[in-house]
Regions:
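A structural signal for multi-pass alpha-helical bundles of membrane permease subunits
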Residues: 1-246
Length: 246
């Protein structure tokens, strides 16, 4: 781990994990609150649409990964034809040449994030929606009387009162995304090259494929410390900046 080669792979994996984590957190929080705002205004078809959006959370990660792997590219094909997945075929009908999603180092992580967005946004929407239902309508009515528009009500009422919910989603999503493994292992195996070689994938490869158990254990210990420090820092920040009073 601490020689030149090991340090290089460590920082590459940590960087890839950080990029993936950043985008998963953004997708979860932004997508979740936008969908919650939409569903909070719905009057017809609410239960059906809510179930459809939330359903991906119940599907196993490995199963979802296999489905998205076929959507993004065809593993049964060879060479350039592997990029002709269902999505690229649909794009070709409109004269658009889609990228080589999972076999191009520049787009492989994006392909995995498609799966992530499909799975997590519905869950975040349900959490945000439950919190929104608990906000007293008196606050909005008083703000309307004072002349506040929709954006101002959202900014000064909804966002502050959803801060504890946002913190919960941030912490749980951060931890889950930092230790992402199944979707990466099924869809790319850490490739092409090391483009999607996140930390847990690298630890798995070291321990169970290269049989370098000692190095895998060392990386695991360092990674655990990183997660612990980040989580403690987040909780300390929240204690000072998040208001838990209703």
């Amino acid at each position: 781990l601490f020689n030149q080669s090991g340090a290089k792979y460590f920082w590459e994996s940590l960087k890839t994990t950080g990029i993936y984590t950043f985008w998963e957190v953004v997708i979860t929080l932004v997508g979740g609150i936008l969908l919650a705002l939409l569903f909070n205004r719905m009057t017809r078809g609410f239960n059906a649409m809510r179930s459809i959006v939330f359903m991906p959370k119940y599907i196993a990660v490995s199963t979802s990964a296999v489905v998205f792997m076929w959507i993004l590219y065809s593993p049964a094909a060879s060479g350039a034809n592997q990029s002709e997945g269902i999505l690229n075929y649909a794009l070709s009908l409109f004269g658009i040449q889609g990228p080589h999603w999972l076999i191009d180092a520049n787009t492989a992580l994006t392909g995995i994030l498609f799966l992530t967005a499909w799975r997590v946004v519905g869950y975040a929407m349900m959490i945000y929606l439950s919190a929104m239902k608990g906000i007293p309508q008196d606050y909005y009515e008083a703000a309307s009387i004072d002349g506040a528009d929709g954006v101002q009500r959202f900014r000064h009422i909804t966002v502050p009162l959803l801060a504890p919910t946002t913190l919960f989603l941030f912490v749980t999503t951060f931890i889950a995304s930092m230790k992402v493994f199944q979707s990466v292992d099924v869809m790319t195996g850490g490739g092409p090259g090391t483009a999607t070689n996140v930390m847990v994938q690298w630890i798995y490869n070291l321990t169970f494929k290269d049989f370098r158990t000692a190095r895998g254990a060392a990386v695991s210990a360092v990674f655990f410390v990183i997660l612990l420090v980040c989580t403690v820092a987040t909780m300390r920040f929240s204690n000072k900046n998040v208001n838990y009073d209703s």
